[in-house]
C-alpha cells in the first residue's frame, strides 16, 4: 500500500511517500527558518501562510521524484496535532481535500508518534518494546513504547524543553536563530572543565526533567563573563554537557526501571553529536542497543508521518472508508490519549 504523508505542525513543510512493501520511496522538505530568522522565532501566521504555498508543490515534487501518480495512492496521512493551530489546519485541509477527491482513507497522525517511530525508517531498526527519549524544542519526554499506539509516559520536563533551553541560551550567547545547532557547533571549540553548570533533577527519584534553572544559571554566567569568543565557546560546552548529562542519566534509569534492552532517541535534539556520543559510551558492553534516526529525520519531516500512517493502516483488519472531507485538528494532544 502506498501512503502519502504530509507534515505541517510548525515551521517545516514535509511530504513523503511510503510503500508498505518497499519502504520509503521519496520525500521532500521545505524549512521556513530563513523567513522566521528576522523575528528570532516562529511567527504562527507566517508559518501557516507559507505552508499553503508549499504543500501542493511538494506533493507534486515527491510524486514526480518517485514516478507515481496521485491515482495510485492508497491513503493519505497527515499531522493532526499537536502544533500550531493555523499550520495544522493547512495540512489537514489539503490532506482531506485530496483524500476526498480520490475517495481514499485519511489517517490522523500524532506528531510525536511520528518522531517516536522515525528510527524505523533506518536499518537496523528497533523492535517493540523499547524506551524512547523524545527530545526537541517543544518536548522532553521518556516513553515506554510497547507497540503502535501503545505509549506510556515515564517522565517529562516540568518546565522548559531541552531544545527550548538550547535555543534560548544560544540567543543569550549572541548566536543566530535557530540557535541550538549553532550552540552545539560553538561548543566544539570549548575548553572542558572551565565552567560548571548545574544538572537540575539529576538525582531526583523520578524520571522528570527541568531545564529552566539551568537556563537561568547560564544567563547569569554569560552576564558575569567578558564576551570573547573563547569564553562563549566554554560556556556553550558547559551548557551542552549539563543538558546531555541529565538526558543520559535519566534515559539509563528508564531502561533499568523497565528492564528493556533498546533505547530510541528522537526529535531535533536527537541530532546532537555529544548526546549521541555519551549514550553510546555509557551503553557499551551493557547489551542495550541505542537507535537514532538519520539526521535528516530528526527534525520535523513528512517521512515519519507517512511511516506512522502506513503502520497504522497495516494494523487495521480492513481498509477504512474514503474521507468524507470533514476533519479536526488538535493543537494540544497527549500522546497517551491515542
Curated annotation (Swiss-Prot):
Q: Where in the cell is it found?
A: Cytoplasm
Tell me how the cofactor is bound.
Answer: Binds 1 Fe(2+) ion per subunit.
Does tRNA processing appear among the keywords? yes
List of residues binding Fe cation: 111, 115, 300
The cross-references to Gene3D superfamilies, in alphabetical order and at most eight, read: 3.30.420.40
Per its UniProt record, the required cofactor names are: Fe(2+)
EC assignment: 2.3.1.234
- One Gene Ontology term from the biological process aspect of the record: tRNA threonylcarbamoyladenosine modification
Highest taxon listed in the record's lineage: Bacteria
Name the reaction it catalyses.
L-threonylcarbamoyladenylate + adenosine(37) in tRNA = N(6)-L-threonylcarbamoyladenosine(37) in tRNA + AMP + H(+)
Top-level enzyme category: transferase
Cellular component GO terms, alphabetical: cytoplasm
Provide a Gene Ontology MF annotation, just one: N(6)-L-threonylcarbamoyladenine synthase activity
Q: Tell me which positions the record assigns to the signal sequence.
A: none
Alphabetically sorted, this entry's keywords are:
Acyltransferase, Cytoplasm, Iron, Metal-binding, Transferase, tRNA processing
UniProt record similarity statement: Belongs to the KAE1 / TsaD family.
Cited function: Required for the formation of a threonylcarbamoyl group on adenosine at position 37 (t(6)A37) in tRNAs that read codons beginning with adenine. Is involved in the transfer of the threonylcarbamoyl moiety of threonylcarbamoyl-AMP (TC-AMP) to the N6 group of A37, together with TsaE and TsaB. TsaD likely plays a direct catalytic role in this reaction.
This protein's name: tRNA N6-adenosine threonylcarbamoyltransferase
Organism of derivation: Nitrosomonas eutropha (strain DSM 101675 / C91 / Nm57)
Amino acid at each position: 500500500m502506498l501512503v502519502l504523508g504530509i507534515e505541517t505542525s510548525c515551521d517545516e513543510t514535509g511530504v513523503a511517500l511510503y510503500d508498505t512493501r518497499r519502504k520509503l520511496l521519496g520525500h521532500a522538505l521545505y524549512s521556513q527558518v530563513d523567513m522566521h530568522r528576522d523575528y528570532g522565532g516562529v511567527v504562527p501566521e507566517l508559518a501557516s501562510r507559507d505552508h499553503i504555498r508549499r504543500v501542493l508543490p511538494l506533493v507534486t515534487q515527491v510524486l514526480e521524484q518517485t514516478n507515481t501518480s496521485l491515482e495510485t495512492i492508497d491513503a493519505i496521512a497527515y499531522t493532526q496535532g499537536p502544533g500550531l493551530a493555523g499550520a495544522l489546519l493547512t495540512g489537514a485541509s489539503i490532506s482531506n481535500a485530496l483524500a476526498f477527491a480520490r475517495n481514499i482513507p485519511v489517517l490522523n497522525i500524532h506528531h510525536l508518534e511520528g518522531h517516536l517511530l522515525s528510527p524505523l525508517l533506518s536499518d537496523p531498526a528497533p523492535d517493540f518494546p523499547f524506551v524512547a527519549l523524545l527530545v526537541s524544542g517543544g518536548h522532553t519526554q521518556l516513553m515506554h513504547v510497547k507497540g503502535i499506539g501503545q505509549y506510556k509516559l515515564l517522565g517529562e520536563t516540568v518546565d522548559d524543553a531541552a531544545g527550548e533551553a538550547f535555543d534560548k541560551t544560544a540567543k543569550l550567547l549572541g548566536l543566530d536563530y535557530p540557535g541550538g545547532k549553532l550552540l552545539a557547533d560553538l561548543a566544539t571549540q570549548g575548553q572542558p572543565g572551565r565552567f560548571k553548570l548545574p544538572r537540575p533533577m539529576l538525582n531526583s527519584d523520578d524520571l522528570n526533567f527541568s531545564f529552566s534553572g539551568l537556563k537561568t544559571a547560564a544567563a547569569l554566567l554569560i552576564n558575569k563573563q567578558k564576551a570573547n569568543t573563547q569564553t562563549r565557546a566554554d560556556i556553550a560546552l558547559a551548557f551542552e554537557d549539563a543538558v546531555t548529562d541529565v538526558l543520559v542519566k535519566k534515559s539509563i534509569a528508564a531502561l533499568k526501571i523497565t528492564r528493556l534492552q533498546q533505547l530510541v532517541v528522537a526529535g531535533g535534539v536527537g541530532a546532537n553529536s555529544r548526546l549521541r556520543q555519551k549514550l553510546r559510551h555509557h551503553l557499551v558492553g551493557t547489551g542495550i542497543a541505542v537507535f537514532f534516526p538519520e539526521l535528516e529525520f530528526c527534525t520535523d519531516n513528512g517521512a515519519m508521518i507517512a511511516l506512522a500512517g502506513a503502520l497504522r493502516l497495516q494494523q487495521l483488519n480492513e481498509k477504512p472508508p474514503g474521507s468524507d472531507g470533514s476533519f479536526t485538528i488538535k493543537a494540544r494532544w497527549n500522546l497517551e490519549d491515542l
